[in-house]
């Protein structure tokens, strides 16, 4: 079964750290939505979308990528890193339009210095850590 993870990691590299850890242990292709906005997903059986959470949403590049490039009727898994809380609503709205089946979701804390968090030196320092990466690897292996 061919798997890909389409990701965006634009501020502190939290999501990239997580998906690269997954790729070291699992057979998945990594696609950077910012650098490869036109990547073809047709040959993949299972597709993951991974992003930090920005204003309670996946990064705009992920939302645009899914809207434009995701073929209908695919098995999907979702991964997010966050300072506050996980939120999958906006990406799930796009996936619903594409008749996709979400087979799993994984989220973990990620270092965040946005807005008021910057005043206190950020939150979730050191995350994702080795335990977070191990849990993400186990999540993908279990799909």
What are these regions (language model features)?
Residues 3-4, 10, 16, 24-29, ...:
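FMN-binding flavodoxin-like domain, especially the glycine-rich phosphate-binding loop
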């Amino acid at each position: 079964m061919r798997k890909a993870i389409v990701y965006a990691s634009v501020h502190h590299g939290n999501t990239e750290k997580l998906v690269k850890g997954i790729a070291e242990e699992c057979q998945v292709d990594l696609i950077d939505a910012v650098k490869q906005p036109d990547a073809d997903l047709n040959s993949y059986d299972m597709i993951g979308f991974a992003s930090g959470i920005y204003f309670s949403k996946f990064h705009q590049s992920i939302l645009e990528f899914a809207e434009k490039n995701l073929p209908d009727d695919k098995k999907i898994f979702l991964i997010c890193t966050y300072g506050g809380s996980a939120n999958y609503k906006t990406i799930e709205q796009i996936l619903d339009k594409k008749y996709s089946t979400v087979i799993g979701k994984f989220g973990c804390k990620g270092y965040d210095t946005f807005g008021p968090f910057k005043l206190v030196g950020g939150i979730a320092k050191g995350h994702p850590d080795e335990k977070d990466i191990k849990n993400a690897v186990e999540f993908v292996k279990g799909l």
